[in-house]
A protein has these predicted regions:
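Divalent metal-cofactor coordination and adjacent catalytic microenvironments
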Residues: 1-110
Length: 110
């Protein structure tokens, strides 16, 4: 399972053609990384959330589903922001919004 496939990203952005697939794919990869960084997820937890590896003892099924739902919204929001503000993106505002979106799943750092 891919958390946000290219086809879903294009639907979210309301893009029908394949002319910008490469750009959207790059922005989608960046959006995923930005969201993982803001949520303070290490690579092991991110691979479980993104569906790259099987969930073993990291999360319960309910926790994983809730986290995936939140991450999906955050990734799509970030993708839309990066796509619409390619030239003048304010990354500080983006990160502050993502912190609020991802607050419930953010990992604590001590």
């Amino acid at each position: 399972m891919i958390l946000v496939p290219l086809s879903e990203a294009k639907t979210y952005l309301r893009i029908d053609s394949s002319d910008e697939d490469t750009l959207i794919d790059v922005l989608l990869t960046s959006a995923k990384q930005i969201c993982a960084d803001v949520a303070r997820l290490d690579s092991d937890k991110w691979s479980v959330i993104s569906g790259e590896t099987e969930n073993t003892d990291t999360y319960t099924d309910e926790e994983l589903e809730r986290i995936q739902d939140v991450m999906k919204v955050a990734i799509l929001y970030t993708l839309g922001y990066l796509y619409e503000h390619r030239e003048e993106a304010d990354h500080h505002d983006l990160v502050m919004t993502l912190r609020n979106l991802l607050f419930a799943i953010r990992e604590g750092v001590f």
